[in-house]
Amino acid sequence: MSAPAIAIIDYDMGNLHSVSKALEVVGARPLISDRPAEIFAADAVVLPGVGAFDPAMARLQERELVPVIEQIIEQGMPFLGICLGLQVLFECSEEGTEPGLGIFAGKVKRFQSEPGLTIPHMGWNQLTLRPSASPLWQHLPPSPWVYFVHSYFVAPEDPSLVAATVCHGQQTVTAAIARNNLFACQFHPEKSGAVGLQLLRNFVALVKD
């Protein structure tokens, strides 16, 4: 099969080119776009994002991308959310007042202050994987190190959504979710070295299947 076309949704929230480059490295044909026709024509969709919740939702609304994302997920097209692209899938955030996409029940919460704890949670940290939770964990070490930059985390109402957790200080929070063909992670695969590339390789393999 030829390289699968993966649409990277462009809504002016963060550098999309590092995600695009990483997908290229693992054998995909990435396309950065905010045009619904191009996004729907792809084999899979990635929603990255860095920044704050309210501006992200405002940009998605302005570009009329909310119904596009909803339809893609409803149709079961392979979907990967990264960082802010995970958070906007939930109902709301303590960071702002805008409603999220509400694909899943739950909210985005801020890390609690602890003595000596740095917020944002920034740098490399180890995941605790739920092995059966996601085909994206194939060929990864048991407790892989990945790269985080965030002050907020998702708290799903349905615990079965959680595919991986991470500890920051005394707090264990959701690091990734998985449901059918939808996956989303709080960490940055494109900044997570060999582990991140393997995760993206697994996503591309899933698209090829």
Curated annotation (Swiss-Prot):
A single Gene Ontology MF term assigned here is: lyase activity
Cross-referenced InterPro entries, in alphabetical order? Class_I_gatase-like (IPR029062), GATASE (IPR017926), Imidazole-glycPsynth_HisH (IPR010139)
Main localisation, per the record? cytoplasm
Q: What is its EC number?
A: 4.3.2.10, 3.5.1.2
Compartment(s)? Cytoplasm
Keywords, sorted A to Z: Amino-acid biosynthesis, Cytoplasm, Glutamine amidotransferase, Histidine biosynthesis, Hydrolase, Lyase
Biological pathway:
Amino-acid biosynthesis; L-histidine biosynthesis; L-histidine from 5-phospho-alpha-D-ribose 1-diphosphate: step 5/9
Catalyzed chemical reaction(s): 5-[(5-phospho-1-deoxy-D-ribulos-1-ylimino)methylamino]-1-(5-phospho-beta-D-ribosyl)imidazole-4-carboxamide + L-glutamine = D-erythro-1-(imidazol-4-yl)glycerol 3-phosphate + 5-amino-1-(5-phospho-beta-D-ribosyl)imidazole-4-carboxamide + L-glutamate + H(+); L-glutamine + H2O = L-glutamate + NH4(+)
Cellular component aspect of the GO annotation: cytoplasm
Asked if Transport is a keyword of the record, the answer is no
- Catalytic site: C83, H188, E190
Chain ranges of the Glutamine amidotransferase type-1 domain: 5-209
Which BP terms in the Gene Ontology apply to this protein?
A: L-histidine biosynthetic process
**Record text on subunit structure and interactions:** Heterodimer of HisH and HisF.
Q: Function of this protein?
A: IGPS catalyzes the conversion of PRFAR and glutamine to IGP, AICAR and glutamate. The HisH subunit catalyzes the hydrolysis of glutamine to glutamate and ammonia as part of the synthesis of IGP and AICAR. The resulting ammonia molecule is channeled to the active site of HisF.
Mind telling me what this protein is named? Imidazole glycerol phosphate synthase subunit HisH
Species of provenance: Thermosynechococcus vestitus (strain NIES-2133 / IAM M-273 / BP-1)
Q: What is the lineage of its organism?
A: Bacteria, Bacillati, Cyanobacteriota, Cyanophyceae, Acaryochloridales
**Gene behind this protein:** hisH
